[in-house]
A protein has these predicted regions:
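Small beta-barrel nucleic-acid-binding modules, primarily SNase/OB-fold domains
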Residues: 2-12, 16-181
Length: 181
């Protein structure tokens, strides 16, 4: 029997691992909402799993609209069973994923993309630096939803010039560093 060279086995293993991560799903109950883009899901085996919503960035808790963003997300998902389509893991070890929740409507139920709902309602930005890992078509929908929310002055867009969370975090780091000197 002929064997594959080790470099091919390594490449094949890496490919299968990335496909496995991309195809992974977590189904569980949301037991905590940290802020407007981070939840904790009680995964199978009673495993609390932190999930960062993919492709969005919501105001931080101490930032203007931070509490409103967190509350909107909590209203959508807290105590409910969600499905997380895993996109990646971040540098903090959190799952990064697209969160889906079933919502009841008069004639049944609809599955809502929670990440998109946060943007549509003006409770988060489309996080352009991290859109490339999303499934086909999602990035465009997220950017379009942000544009619509801005034009119709939804949520944080009622402010004339809301500060994006990535800029706010950078400003906070600068303040801490200048205060330490």
């Amino acid at each position: 029997m002929k064997t594959l060279p080790s470099k091919w086995l390594i490449a094949l293993s890496a490919l299968l691992l990335s496909l496995n991560l991309a195809a992974a799903e977590i189904i569980g109950k949301v037991i905590a909402v940290a802020d407007g883009d981070t939840i904790t899901v009680l995964a199978p085996g009673n495993r609390p799993t932190k999930v960062r919503l993919a492709g969005i960035d919501a105001p931080e808790r101490n930032q203007p609209f931070g509490q409103k963003s967190r509350q909107h997300l909590a209203d959508l998902v807290f105590g409910k069973e969600v499905r997380v389509s895993v996109v990646d893991k971040d540098r903090y070890g959190r799952i990064v994923g697209i969160v889906y929740v079933p919502l009841k409507i008069p004639n049944g139920e609809v599955i809502v993309d929670v990440d998109l709902a946060q943007i549509e309602s003006g409770h988060a930005w489309a996080y352009r630096d991290y859109l490339k890992g999303l499934p086909a078509g999602k990035a465009g929908r997220y950017v379009a939803a942000e544009k619509d929310a801005k034009e119709t002055k939804q949520g944080l867009w009622t402010d004339k010039n809301p500060e994006p969370p990535w800029q706010w975090r950078k400003d906070q780091r600068s303040k801490r560093q200048s205060g330490a000197n």
